[in-house]
């Protein structure tokens, strides 16, 4: 938001994106002045965002995956894709993450947040099974926001 990016957080039933996968449908009509649309999410929310993106490639410009992967084939979608995870993430299934890279466009930008963990992308506290972060959640989120601003050509 500091870089002029409209950020819309969509409230999900029980905080689970899987319970309302099409919640983003009504967002563009509420912000008609916006011309470039990206969808993204963290963990399961990222996986659901990827599934949504695969079905709405004509309406979106890109996808942001935070500690998430896409099971949907986006290789020829025309979408820009940014993926990030923390080096200390103990929740993300790295084998599945690596295996599902095949579903992303070849020019996908990937960032590993050094010292970051799974929960560091959010504001919900420690998560069972996660690694011990070396940086604060605030630092992880700032690094992510800065990297996204560069990726979106805003800096």
Feature names for model-found ranges:
Residues 11, 64-67, 84, 114:
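Alpha/beta-hydrolase-fold catalytic nucleophile elbow
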Residues 77, 83-85:
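Short beta-strand/loop motif that positions the catalytic acidic residue
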Residues 40-49:
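Gly/Ala-rich beta-loop-alpha elbow adjacent to hydrolase catalytic centers
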Residues 7-9, 81, 110-112:
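Conserved beta-strand scaffold positions in the cores of enzyme catalytic domains, especially
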Residues 51-61, 70-71:
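Conserved hydrolase catalytic core segment
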Residues 2, 85-139:
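Active-site-adjacent alpha-helix of alpha/beta-hydrolase-fold enzymes
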Residues 1-36, 128-129, 133:
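Serine-hydrolase catalytic machinery in alpha/beta-hydrolase-like enzymes
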């Amino acid at each position: 938001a500091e870089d002029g990016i409209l950020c819309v957080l969509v409230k999900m039933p029980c905080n689970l994106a899987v319970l309302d996968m099409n919640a983003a449908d009504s967002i563009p009509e509420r912000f008609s002045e916006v011309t470039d649309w990206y969808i993204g999410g963290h963990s399961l929310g990222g996986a659901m965002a990827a599934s949504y993106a695969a079905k709405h490639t004509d309406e979106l410009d890109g996808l942001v995956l935070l500690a998430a992967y896409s099971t949907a084939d986006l290789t020829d979608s025309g979408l820009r894709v940014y993926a990030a995870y923390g080096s200390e993430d103990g929740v993300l299934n790295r084998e599945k993450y690596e295996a599902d890279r095949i579903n992303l466009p070849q020019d996908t930008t990937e960032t590993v947040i050094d010292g970051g963990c799974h929960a560091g992308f959010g504001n919900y506290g420690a998560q069972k099974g996660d690694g011990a972060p070396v940086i604060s959640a605030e630092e992880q989120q700032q690094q992510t926001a800065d990297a996204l601003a560069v990726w979106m050509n805003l800096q």
